[in-house]
Amino acid sequence: NRPYSFGL
């Protein structure tokens, strides 16, 4: 999981 929660 990425440190940011975007739908990229």
UniProtKB/Swiss-Prot annotation:
Tissue expression summary: In larvae, expressed in the CNS and midgut but not in the ring gland, thoracic perisymapthetic organs (tPSO) or abdominal perisymapthetic organs (aPSO) (at protein level). In adults, expressed in brain and thoracic-abdominal ganglion but not in corpora cardiaca and corpora allata (at protein level).
Entry-annotated residues carrying Leucine amide: 8
Cellular component aspect of the GO annotation: extracellular region
Gene Ontology terms describing biological process: neuropeptide signaling pathway
Keyword Secreted found: yes
Annotated keywords: Amidation, Neuropeptide, Secreted
Family: Belongs to the allatostatin family.
Entry protein name: Allatostatin-A2
Organism of derivation: Delia radicum
